A protein has these predicted regions:
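Alpha-helical assembly-interface signal, strongest on the long, hydrophobic N-terminal helix that forms
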Residues: 2-76
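Short secondary-structure transition/capping segments
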Residues: 2-8, 96-105, 136-143
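Residue-level preference for non-acidic, small/hydrophobic
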Residues: 45, 111, 134-136
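Short amphipathic secondary-structure patches
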Residues: 49-112
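Generic short beta-strand segments
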Residues: 113-119
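Low-complexity, S/T/G/P-rich flexible repeat/linker segments used as non-globular hinges
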Residues: 119-143
């Protein structure tokens, strides 16, 4: 069968497509999906930060001028992160709030999210996570 140059050339191109080009195309699509998911995580984190910034304990702020979040801030932030992640939840990627912190100097609330993005890649790549952080300003100047 492999007595001509054409047969060798055909076999070489079949091997090249099978082992080089097709896996590279699959990875390129996966990386594109990853960056889209990353942008979605930052959008979700911004929504979660805005929601958490609404959960300021007003009585504590009036007494001490310190921003303290209510205990419900984590749950509200988690709910708003889920509301703003349609692309992710459509692919069974569920962002979860990993941290909420308050910067007293700038009066900003920061929310960090993390999700397992392994479903965007082939099965040999597991443990791929995507992170996002959002910020919102707690505007309490009129109080």
């Amino acid at each position: 069968m492999l007595h001509s140059r054409k047969a060798y050339s055909t076999l070489w191109w079949i091997g090249y497509y099978t082992f080089c080009l097709i896996p590279l195309m699959v990875m390129a699509v996966g990386i594109g999906r990853y960056f889209y998911a990353r942008a979605e995580m930052f959008k979700s984190a911004d929504g979660a930060a805005l929601a958490a910034a609404q959960e300021v304990d007003v009585v504590t702020y009036l007494n001490t001028k310190q921003i303290v979040l209510l205990p419900s801030a984590y749950g509200v932030a988690q709910a708003y992160a889920a509301y703003n992640s349609d692309y992710l939840t459509g692919r069974r990627i569920y962002p979860r709030v990993t941290a909420i912190r308050v910067d007293q100097a700038t009066k900003k609330v920061y929310v960090s999210l993390r999700a397992d993005a392994s479903s965007l890649f082939p099965s040999i790549l597991r443990g791929v996570t995507v992170n996002g952080e959002g910020e919102a300003e707690a505007r309490l100047g009129s109080l």
